[in-house]
Amino acid sequence: MRLSQSVLTALLICVNSAAFANVEVTLPSNSELVLVNGKESDSTDKLTLENGENQLALRYIGRYQQQGSQTQFSSDVIIMTFLAENTSLTIALPRIRSNSAADAFNRDPKISLKNSSEVDIAFRQDKLLKEGMQLGRDYEKEVAEYNSNNQVASVAALAPSITALVQAKPVVIENHGQPKNTINQSDQVNVGQMLDFWYQQADEETRKAFKLKINSKE
């Protein structure tokens, strides 16, 4: 059974479409991936992302010789957001060989994003900065807040919903209409038992005085 040329062409198109049904991103060896679309990822050198808008958070990591000593450099966290479909992309970072180059990169990170044809792909870029202590940072929380504030590289779809924010911060309502020092039912029973006990132990005169006291309170 022979297949017509049109059928073969259609099959070939389907195969090619299946081969590029998403976006593949190759990461440079001198980078550390922090988050992918607001979530942690185990990937180290290659990512497979859905078509559409995607957001990566990464940093430059590397070593260089400075005045005879080995220096370890880790940059600020960089956020890059891009729009792509059915393609293969490559991220490239410059080589850093001095303290001045490291400082310059932190001030203004130079990153390139190209497709398989070496054509530059447009993307939005920003830095995820935090003042004070840097250890133990919650990057997922920071990026969620970043995306909620309409920043340069923010993605509205990755911002937490209003419902999630309400659930995360439960509202405590105080009832000011009732006294705070309320006595529960079990305490009331214990008090009644104690009063009954002392009433039985009292003489007749004390019992009369107790009754008058109770009646005056009603």
Curated annotation (Swiss-Prot):
It comes from Shewanella piezotolerans (strain WP3 / JCM 13877). This is UPF0319 protein swp_2242. Keywords: Signal. The lineage of its organism: Bacteria, Pseudomonadati, Pseudomonadota, Gammaproteobacteria, Alteromonadales. Belongs to the UPF0319 family. Residues 1-21 form the signal peptide.
